Regions:
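Cytoplasmic membrane-interface segments at the C-terminal ends of transmembrane helices
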Residues: 8-12, 32-34, 156, 170, ...
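Secretory targeting and sorting signals
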Residues: 2, 9-34
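Actinobacteria-biased recognition of intrinsically disordered, low-complexity terminal regions
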Residues: 1-10, 44-49
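N-terminal carbohydrate-binding/catalytic regions of secreted carbohydrate-active enzymes
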Residues: 51-153, 315-319, 325-329, 333-334, ...
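C-terminal region of N-terminal signal peptides and the immediate post-cleavage residues
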Residues: 26-48
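Substrate-binding cleft of extracellular glycoside hydrolase catalytic domains
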Residues: 97, 105-204, 218-219, 223, ...
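Surface-exposed substrate-engagement region within the catalytic domains
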Residues: 58-83, 198, 211-333
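Hydrophobic faces of well-ordered beta-strands that scaffold small-molecule active sites
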Residues: 53-61, 89-90, 115-119, 159-163, ...
């Protein structure tokens, strides 16, 4: 399974401006009470807005493979029982051969299990914005063609899609409202529109960063509205990050309130990456910080307050880069030492 590339993902602080627009939108949404699944219903077009997840299907196998290949390692049993048995998302990073094989595999396993796969798109032009070296050399045209291929591979399979971690988080650094900013917004909107039009059983969540203060919730809501977040397209918070549940919930709820009040979206939905947020506090250290612990296991919730799912979007034990508690582990590489540290 493709791993996230060896990049250092950084959550910086900088001043932000809020863009306020009021749109009119009326819809109706009903959630089932079965905790294993949820359905979205829109009064205008029920079939187009329904997603019955069934079980979440493991989509990233790095951890399972490590356990399989290290039967004599004293850490293997604990990693197997407390991490590997949970469904974890797969990351697609632009390697066409790996992406085709891996996406085909998770789609097949989801269909066979009657469940839902989890996929992260992480291939946006200028990914990581050069913080870890040269900018990601993908043009908007090449990116759109890649999105088309991924959409075709997914087809009618049931999928939770997380769209481009950090892309909106760094958008304002690309000369506010300038050409690069516009390209990024257009690329993300293309993902949203493509999967909304072609993949009826895919639920899309655009990454909305975390609660470190680098981007205000109100500014993030404005950015999410620009790329097409609506009642049928949600947002994801805390991806690959460590904000505790209370803190990240407050951040997500402020985004939700802004989307409702300023952009006329009656019931914005979101998911939370809880893979590494079991601590009650966080000092905003983003790169393999010591002392972190596992968070709440993945679960489909469908709460009335907008929370659809707790997910493990980054595999617990995956390195953020060669730093912190894993100075020798490249970004995206599974580190049994990091994984074991999370099991305290």
């Amino acid at each position: 399974v493709t791993r996230a590339p060896a990049v250092r993902r950084r959550r910086r602080r900088w001043p932000c401006a809020a863009a306020l627009t009021v749109l009119g939108l009326i819809a109706a949404m009903v959630l089932t009470r079965d905790s294993s699944k949820f359905e979205y219903r829109d009064a205008a077009d029920t079939a187009a807005h329904r997603l019955d997840t069934g079980p979440l299907v493991p989509s990233a196998l790095d951890v399972q493979w490590w356990v399989r290949d290290h039967p004599g390692d004293a850490r293997a049993a604990a990693i197997r029982d407390r991490i590997a048995r949970h469904p974890i998302a797969m990351w697609a990073t632009g390697n066409d051969e790996d992406d085709s094989r891996n996406i085909g595999d998770i789609v097949t396993r989801a269909r066979d299990a009657g469940g839902t796969a989890q996929l992260v798109l992480y291939n946006i032009p200028d990914r990581d914005d050069g913080f870890s070296g040269p900018h990601h050399a993908v043009t908007p045209r090449v990116y759109r063609a890649w999105v088309d291929r991924v959409s075709a591979l997914v087809g009618d399979a049931r999928l939770v899609l997380i769209v481009e971690p950090d892309a909106l988080w760094f958008a304002d650094r690309q000369s506010l409202e300038g050409t690069d900013f516009g390209d990024r917004i257009d690329s993300l909107r293309y993902v949203v529109e493509t999967f909304s039009a072609r993949n009826a059983n895919t639920r899309v969540y655009v990454d909305a960063g975390t609660s470190s203060g680098s981007v205000t919730p109100e500014r993030m809501a404005a950015l999410l509205a620009k790329v097409g977040v609506s009642d049928r397209v949600g947002y994801a918070v805390n991806v690959s990050s460590f904000a505790p549940t209370a803190e990240i919930t407050a951040y997500a709820q402020r985004i939700r309130a802004a989307l409702q009040q300023w952009f006329g979206i009656p019931d914005p939905r979101y998911v939370v990456d809880t893979s590494q947020n079991g601590n009650p506090d966080w000092n905003f250290d983003w790169c393999n910080p010591a002392g972190r612990i596992l968070g709440t296991p993945p679960a489909v919730l469908g709460h009335h307050d907008g929370l659809d799912m707790n997910l493990w979007i980054l595999a617990p034990g995956s390195s953020n880069g060669p730093c912190g508690a894993a100075p020798d582990a490249p970004g995206g590489q599974f580190s049994p030492a990091l994984a074991t540290a999370l099991l305290r």
